[in-house]
Structure formats: C-alpha cells, structure tokens
Amino acid sequence: MNVSAFLVRLTQMLPLFAGLSLLSACGPEDPNAFAPECVPVGILAEAADMSSYAGPSHDLSTLAFQAGIAGINGTCSDAGKGHALHTQASVVISVQRGPAATVRDVTIPYFIALVHGSDIVSKHDLSITAHFPPNVDRLALKSDPLIMDLPISRRMNSDSYRLEVGLQLTPEQLAYNREHMPH
C-alpha cells in the first residue's frame, strides 16, 4: 500500500476513531458517567425530642430542659470515580431551659446511624453542649459536620443506604416519648 492510499484509508476511518474516543469518555474515568444521589436522611420520631425533669414528676414546674432535633444539613459528592459517596451531615438541635434548670450548660447526646437495608452499618454517638448566657433560655445549636465515605457502585447505589438521626435517650425518656407520641 502506498502512502497516498494509506492516507485516504486513514481519512475514511477518522469518523470511526472519533466515535470510539467519545465512547471511551463514558468509561469509569468520566466523572459524569456515574453521578450518585445523596443518601436519604430521616429523623427517628421516637428519638426526636428529649425532656429532662428535676424529680419524678413530669409537669412543667419540674422541667430542667427540653431538646429537639430541628433539622439536618448535609452535602454529598462522588469521592472516588464512582466507588464512594463522600457525605457530610450536621444536626440542628433546639434546646430550651425549663423552670427547674439549675445549670447554664447542658450537654445533649445524639447519634447519626448509617443503615443499609435493615442493618445498622455504623452508629456515631455524638454530643453537643448548649451554653446559656444570662437571660437566654432558648438556643439553636448546629453540630460540626460528620464526614463519611460510603462504598457504592452501580449495583449498590446511595438508595441502598439511609442516615437515621436521633437524640440518645435513656430508657425512661424513650418510654415517655412513645407514650406521648401522636398516633
């Protein structure tokens, strides 16, 4: 084959090479080839609120403090060529001092659990402290972000997981919440 015939043949094949190069962009190296969604997040209804009383009576005069999960903020992004989902989650907790409060600092324990199907993959026990200045009885606190990299693939996507958030309650507080939840 002479040089001119080779160049003519090469020119005829250029569209084929161009098409193959476009297809190669759809492989695992293309960040747009696999764009996972963020993990669904939920607040456990039974663990969304916490009341602490000074004494056995559960009336307003003995309320030391009350806390509740007011919201969850977060972001997610592809953390590794479609193999991990980089997730950040922060919790917003509202805290109110009650008439029986004797301290200005209250530590609120909470958790963020990563659930896959019906299994708890990991549970992060965390806490945040409310510092009440004089003449302030209500605060909204935002936690530092919890950072997690979740393994994902085309078969095991972000919908396979969910984050569950709640306040870490004593058995008595949990029973109280269950008893007083709307049905």
Language-model features: locations:
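Bacterial N-terminal signal peptides that target proteins for export
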Residues: N2-P15
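C-terminal motif of bacterial Sec signal peptides marking the signal peptidase cleavage site
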Residues: S21-A25
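Bacterial signal peptide processing site
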Residues: G27-D30
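Post-signal peptide N-terminal segment of mature Sec-exported envelope proteins
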Residues: F34-S57
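Helix-rich interaction surfaces within compact, conserved domain-sized segments
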Residues: A35-P36, S122-H183
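Short, solvent-exposed beta-strand/turn "edge" segments of beta-rich domains on protein surfaces
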Residues: D59-F65, N73-T87, R97-R104, R154-M156
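Beta-strand elements of well-folded, non-transmembrane domains
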Residues: G71-C76, A89-P99, Y110-S118, A130-P134, ...
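A short, structured loop/turn motif at beta-sheet edges
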Residues: K81-A84, L114-V121, R155-D159
